[in-house]
Amino acid sequence: DERVLQFYRWVMVNKRAPSTPTHADSAPDMPAQASLDQVSFPHVARFDASATGGDRFWEDYAAGERIAHPQGMTIEEAEHQMATRLYQNTARVHFNQLQQSASRHGRRIVYGGHVISVAHALSFDGLENVLGMAAWNGGSHTNPTFAGDTLFAWSDVLERIDIGRDDIGALRLRLVAVKNVDPSREDVALKVAGEDGRERYHANVVLDLDYVALIPKRAAAG
């Protein structure tokens, strides 16, 4: 058998008794970045940039660059429930409004996988010629998303990775999604200091995802 996917997932579970210890110090040690040694990179030949409408290749991106994705997308109740069913997620927090009416939010929460999907779709407007994801290094659903929220996103280029091939390279990207604020019109702080002095994600930030994307090099252009 050949392994095609492996990931570590942390889930939020309500405590029956708030005083129950969390054993936070028992978390296993994990690498900060996924190893690309086991990633199967496709071969790219005669890449037709005219089909994508983009002229930026691996060499044209630089660490420290921020790419704003201009489009926004409003989440609708029916579509996020349909998508969640397709993901085979049956958690009541996403479907049962009668139950959620008594919760602290009073509403159904949009499934985090749908938030990732929307943010990744928005990123295609600005990330030119990216072929797809190779690995996730880590990520956080930082605040809940609800139907009626409008999502925007930006990508920070953390690293340009040369895998030793002439036709393809990789970019380490940080994809951030925010709700109900357009980052092209006003600044959005990623994190803010709380009343207790601890740093927390801004209330409008809903996703912080660190991943590796594949992108052709200029030599592969047809």
Describe the residue ranges of each PLM region:
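HotDog/MaoC-like acyl-thioester-processing domains
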Residues: 1-41, 46, 147, 154-222
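Catalytic strand-loop segment that frames the active site of acyl-thioester-processing enzymes
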Residues: 16-18, 29-110, 217
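Hydrophobic beta-strand-centered segment that forms part of the acyl-chain substrate-binding groove
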Residues: 104-105, 110, 115-160
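A generic structural signal for short, non-catalytic loop/turn and secondary-structure boundary residues
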Residues: 62, 129, 202-204
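Short, intrinsically disordered/low-complexity patches at protein termini
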Residues: 27-30, 91-93, 133-134, 140, ...
